[in-house]
Every structure is written in structure tokens, then in C-alpha cells.
């Protein structure tokens, strides 16, 4: 089982990740980390609150990238939004993460969930309007079942990671 991190607090999440107890973590829902912080700072004037929010989120991503073992997979679940150009992206707060960082660009795998014909699916590759991406040989089709265990097994198989459950 993955360790599900569902607490909207960067310090707690980063502490849990640094403990290195598990081979997989699920952060659900990462977008709420930004949204809750925005609400906490709603009475602050100016752009500093947006800068703080972006830096806290970027620090979380840096912790994931630099402070978890190579064979540890952190699944970041987030909401999406459509831009004014019709493209789909991870929903963020403010412009700093979008304009200076582009969150999706930090990851080698980005899947998007959707519902069709009474089934939930993941899209594994972009059609030019979504941020979806994965190594071409990782999945057999452009759409797969919305099954995180299947995804985890495919990633571990592709990269040669231990499939050990913890």
C-alpha cells in the first residue's frame, strides 16, 4: 500500500517524505495545498502571498526530487484547468508556477484521468492540448484503466525498480 498524504501542510508532508519509510506516496490533492494557503493569506495585500505559495510548492517538489530514494515514487494528484488557449494544465495559484516553472515539466510521467462510457481512464500521451506524457514504451495504449497499482507496476517494471509492497 502507498502512504497516502492527505494533510494540507507542507511541513508534515515533507517530513514524511524525508523519513524514507515507503517506496510510494500519494499526495492527494496537491492543488489544495496552494488553495488552502491562499485562503489563509486572503487578507494580505500584494503579490508576496503568491510568491510565498509558489515557493512553498516548489520546495515540496524539490524535496520529492532530491530527498526521496531513486526507487521511491511520489504520486501527486491535482486538479486541472483549461487555459485561455484551450490547453489543459495543472491548476495552480498565481502566475509564478505557470510562467517561471511549469509544474508538469518537472515530471517524466503525467497522466490525466477522465470519465467516459461509465469508466475512469488515464491518458498516457498528449494530443497537443494536455500535459500528458510517459515514456513511449511504458504503456501499450494511449488510454489505460484508472488503476494506480497498474501504473505503479508499469513504472517499476520500466525503470527496473523493486516491486516490493510498502
Where are these regions (language model features)?
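Residues that form generic nucleotide/phosphate-binding pockets
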Residues: 16, 67, 154, 158
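Intrinsically disordered, low-complexity regions
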Residues: 10, 42-44, 152
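Hydrophobic, Leu/Ile/Phe/Ala-enriched alpha-helical segments that form helix-helix packing faces
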Residues: 17, 64-68, 107
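Conserved GTP-binding G-domain of TRAFAC-class P-loop NTPases and closely related GTPase folds
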Residues: 83-166
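Basic, amphipathic N-terminal segments that precede the first structured/catalytic domain
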Residues: 1-24, 142-149, 162-166
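Phosphate-binding glycine-rich loops and adjacent basic patches that engage nucleotide phosphates
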Residues: 20-31, 114-120
